[in-house]
Amino acid sequence: MFQRFLTCAKITAAQWVLDWYPQGKTSIESRFNINGKIGWATMESAGFITLLYIMYSLPKELGLGELPWGNWTMAGCFVSMEGGSVRNVLMGCKVFHYLYRAVASPLFLNPSMSPIHPFVWILAFGFQMFNAISIGGYLAGYGPTSQYEWAARSEYMFLGLVIWCWGLLANMFHDDDLREIRRAADRKQRKAAAEQGTPVEKVDKIYMIPKNGLFKYSLHAHYLCEWIEWAGWWMIGGWQCVPARTFLLNEITTMLPRALQGKRWYEKKFGKDKLQGRKAIIPGVL
């Protein structure tokens, strides 16, 4: 499973030649569309729930007993640098990331979300399930299970955690900058409706070129920050941690063509001159 999960990258290769991506700003009108908030939360939460199930059940089947609660929290790594401390960090990072990404972001933080086509939902659901099984199996018993197996690279854990934290916070910052564009549109439309005495049935989606933080140089800075986040997570687990490495490679091969596709969308909607030299994802490079 660890090795074959990389085949997901081959499936997403179609994005290099097709601009058809019925989600987000490139969503399409379809009778089969799924509500954006519900679609995002369900396809992301499936992997998260599966990961938790594996972490609870697999250790018993392998005769390892119950994993301590510290394995489920990032704080565990600050308490002890022994035994399952790396699993503590890795599991805590995954839990926190997906609580933000699968629950808080779509259901509570995003003012609105474009509909998702079932085709995208199915592919994303499959990706999450493969990812959860790959990572969950590794962390719950098929990877290193003793402090001796982790001791040789314990010095990289802190650096990896710092990189992961920076990537997550930067990703959240840039995500919120995109949300503020929608919130500003929401406030403006509601104010106009209140002045006219008319009810607000729905808020029209407004698209602008984001300009804060790394958005000054990259149109998809939030993608780049997520790559950095998971590169740090891979470092925490060690360079030989195949599920972490494979996950990062899948993220890059999936999100890079999407970013290039998004740049073409921005150029078509606003014109190349309005982008002021911004790259698709890596400032000054690509």
Regions found by a protein language model. Give the residues of each.
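Hydrophobic alpha-helical transmembrane segments of polytopic
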Residues: 36, 40-47, 90-97, 120, ...
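Hydrophobic transmembrane alpha-helices
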Residues: 1-4, 51-54, 125-127, 142-286
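Intramembrane catalytic core of multi-pass membrane enzymes that act on lipidic substrates
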Residues: 32, 56-141
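Juxtamembrane membrane-interface segments at transmembrane-helix boundaries in membrane proteins
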Residues: 20-39, 67-85, 147-157, 205-212, ...
